[in-house]
Amino acid sequence: EPVLRRIQRRIITCRRSDGVELSFTLCLPADHSPQQPPLPALLWAYPREFNDPETAGQVSGSVNRFNTLAGASHLFLVSLGYAVLDEVSMPVIGSPADANDSFIRQISDSAAAVIQAAAEIGAIDPARVAVGGHSYGAFMAATLLAHTDLFRAGIARSGAYNRTLTPFGFQNERRTFWEAPEVYMQLSPRSEEHTS
């Protein structure tokens, strides 16, 4: 665990294609230097809903706190030579009545911007990135794996992947399945599985 206490942490900010400000904490192994080759990475996030871009763009993390690890923390991957893009802001902006109509586009744009920002500073290899999350973050990870080519692998812990099984709403979705069946189907990554 001493290695994990010395994780290098850095707040990175960037913008997604629609101009929304994003931030994430770049976690690197204690002995990593900028002269070394880019690392494989894990992007770990949990999407959150916002009514406006200004609120969504606020930086919420800090490098001035202790590394706390519990259970099967994704930060253990740093000790194995991975970069971890942690506390990634993954905002879904819109009215509570219809924010999920653009959920896939918004999280895809956020993921692409964060990967590009970390790659541009030489920290990660954009061809070797995994995505992960827990609960709603797991749903996000499965959705990104189903709808983008940004990731090579994923960790989806305890998520809901078939929204037709939550017909009376989920997260901040207020419409029922019967009011917005196309949204429920689109947001069911289980129905988008591809085999190769």
Where are these regions (language model features)?
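Short beta-strand element of the alpha/beta-hydrolase
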Residues: 28, 36-49
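Flexible, active-site-proximal loop/turn residues at the rims of small-molecule/cofactor binding pockets
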Residues: 31, 48-49, 91, 160
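Short beta-strand motif preference
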Residues: 22-24, 41, 85
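Short, conserved, GDST-rich strand-edge loop motifs in beta-rich repeat architectures
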Residues: 51-64
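Serine-hydrolase catalytic-loop signature spanning alpha/beta hydrolases and amidase-signature enzymes
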Residues: 49-51, 84
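Non-catalytic accessory segments flanking enzyme active sites
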Residues: 1-34, 72-75, 79, 117
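Active-site-proximal cap/loop segments of hydrolase catalytic domains
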Residues: 63-196
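Short amphipathic alpha-helix with an adjacent loop that forms part of the alpha/beta core around
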Residues: 33-36, 191
